[in-house]
């Protein structure tokens, strides 16, 4: 994402840098996406799964959709085009911040419809727990690596 100017960079405010220097750093990193600053250095470990490692997790999610689409006779390139554009549009909806992720999910899930059936599988398989565990393991490893 950074190579495309769509990354997410994290910086720590500390006594070694002036506010002006921090602003300059943010300005520089903002040319590659967005920058979030934290007060405590340990937050750099805590944020790794949500920015640094997240692309791999999102690629895996996209790949799972592509593999499923192929099983249903959809061309791989077409499937990738569909899921990529859907991810872009969904991310833009989230960035508007006028609805929470839960509200957006409810807006897409018609009672008795197709989407709700798929969501039931994600809930039954504990998607939220799986994501939480992956993030916890990532953070734990970040601390181990120092």
What are these regions (language model features)?
Residues 43-49, 101-106:
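Short pre-catalytic strand/loop immediately N-terminal to key active-site residues, enriched for Gly-Thr
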Residues 81-146:
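NAD(P)-dependent Rossmann-like dehydrogenase/reductase catalytic/cofactor-binding core
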Residues 8-46, 57-96, 141, 145:
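Internal alpha-helical scaffold of NAD(P)-dependent oxidoreductase catalytic cores
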Residues 1-2:
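Active-site PLP-lysine loop of aminotransferase-like
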